[in-house]
């Protein structure tokens, strides 16, 4: 089975690469030093310091594996490429909600960069998936866990 790509902006890929670099060169060393210091204290079978450091190490290694996996599947979005007016990953989309007339603008990004509070929604979310392939003036109905949303696309950039 082929895995889906992880869509990332250039900035998002750089951010994940920087995090991976920091975790593997700085954080990993600090945790190894904590483990060594706890071992020097003597009996590690009842050492809270040692247990805490080992838990931190396990969490760190899990995050490192996750980042490596994300980056190995990364497909960088060319945000400068013309979308021909169609919503795609990397597009900014302005919509109007039919129920109250309010407008919002979102950027469609891959799930690794999604942050709805910052206006960045995942292409895999119900809203993001419903917008993909649509154009300005299209009406869209989105089925979400909290109910049905009806909106009109005003602008695609």
UniProtKB/Swiss-Prot annotation:
InterPro entries according to UniProt: GreA/GreB_C_sf, Tscrpt_elong_fac_GreA, Tscrpt_elong_fac_GreA/B, Tscrpt_elong_fac_GreA/B_C, Tscrpt_elong_fac_GreA/B_fam, Tscrpt_elong_fac_GreA/B_N, Tscrpt_elong_fac_GreA/B_N_sf
Organism (species): Chloroflexus aurantiacus (strain ATCC 29366 / DSM 635 / J-10-fl)
Residue runs in coiled coils: 47-75
Record carries keyword Transcription regulation: yes
Function description: Necessary for efficient RNA polymerase transcription elongation past template-encoded arresting sites. The arresting sites in DNA have the property of trapping a certain fraction of elongating RNA polymerases that pass through, resulting in locked ternary complexes. Cleavage of the nascent transcript by cleavage factors such as GreA or GreB allows the resumption of elongation from the new 3'terminus. GreA releases sequences of 2 to 3 nucleotides.
Signal peptide: none
PANTHER family: TRANSCRIPTION ELONGATION FACTOR GREA (PTHR30437:SF4)
Keywords: Coiled coil, DNA-binding, Transcription, Transcription regulation
GO BP field: DNA-templated transcription elongation; regulation of DNA-templated transcription elongation
GO molecular function terms attached to this record: DNA binding; RNA polymerase binding
Pfam families: GreA_GreB, GreA_GreB_N
SUPFAM superfamilies cross-referenced by the UniProt entry: FKBP-like, GreA transcript cleavage protein, N-terminal domain
Stated family: Belongs to the GreA/GreB family.
The organism's taxonomic lineage, starting at the top: Bacteria, Bacillati, Chloroflexota, Chloroflexia, Chloroflexales
Protein name per the record: Transcription elongation factor GreA
Key word Oxidoreductase present: no
């Amino acid at each position: 089975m082929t895995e889906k790509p992880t869509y990332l902006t250039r900035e998002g890929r750089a951010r994940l690469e920087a995090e991976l670099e920091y975790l593997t060169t700085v954080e990993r060393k600090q945790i190894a030093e904590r483990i060594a210091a706890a071992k020097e204290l003597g009996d590690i079978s009842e050492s809270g310091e040692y247990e805490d450091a080992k838990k931190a190490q396990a969490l760190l290694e899990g995050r490192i594996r996750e980042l490596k996996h994300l980056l190995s599947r990364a497909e960088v979005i060319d945000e400068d490429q013309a979308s021909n007016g169609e919503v795609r990953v990397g597009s900014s989309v302005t919509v109007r909600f039919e129920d109250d007339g309010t407008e919002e603008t979102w950027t469609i990004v891959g799930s690794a960069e999604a942050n709805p509070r910052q206006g960045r929604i995942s292409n895999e979310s119900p809203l993001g998936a419903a917008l993909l392939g649509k154009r300005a003036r299209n009406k869209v109905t989105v089925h979400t866990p909290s109910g049905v949303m009806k909106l009109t696309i005003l602008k695609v950039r």
